[in-house]
Amino acid sequence: MLFLGPHACEEALVRGELHSLWIAPAAWGRVARLVADARNAGVVLRREPMEALDRKAQGQRHQGVLGEGGAFAYAAIEDLEASLRARGDAALFLALDGVTDPHNLGAILRSAAGAGVDGVILPERRSAAVNETVIRASAGTAGRVPVCRVVNLGRALDGLKEAGAWIYGLAAGEGSRSYLDEPFDRPTVLVLGAEGEGLHLKIRERCDGLLHIPMPGGIESLNVSAAAAVALFRVLARRGPHGA
């Protein structure tokens, strides 16, 4: 996996995922701390011309710094269930049903990391995987939150429900109530669907309740990454300083 830009490389180094670091001469002085930390960690350092980094990144922005490492380390669903039991009513998870755009996924993971989410669940099918584009879009923060890929999202939600979670689907329409009215005072899983399609029926049926974000301006909906950020930080606001 490639880590594009200094922030993504710093995060990968902290997680122990960085194997080699390519730095263009013009960027060397700007990342002296990263170079020192990487050298201390035994990471292979390579001073390469900008053209070499451009070829390696295949047109993606890298700011003169590019890292190589292993595949993204996904969490197991059992780890998330254990975290739920340990955190009790403060537990907060995010499940994504059919979010295929890597830029949206990266933005969502950045918000999830900022909100201190206990885990993000993705289906293996009909979903973007965590790759270089996602890590770049997350500003390098994708590894700060446990991300789990599952064969069957519905079964994963069933397992979290059995462990004590309350499943909320973010969806407008009949039977949905405003998220402003929900106290979020129990272990919570927020489920968001793809833009345009929304939640699939089998996922919708597994939800304990449906919530929507009011739109007084008259637009139909928010971008899925914006909706995720709004919903996550609403949960934190409702719980107060001791509920996160």
Per-region residue spans from a language model:
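Short, glycine/polar-rich helix-capping loops at beta-to-alpha or helix-loop-helix junctions
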Residues: 30, 127-133, 197-206
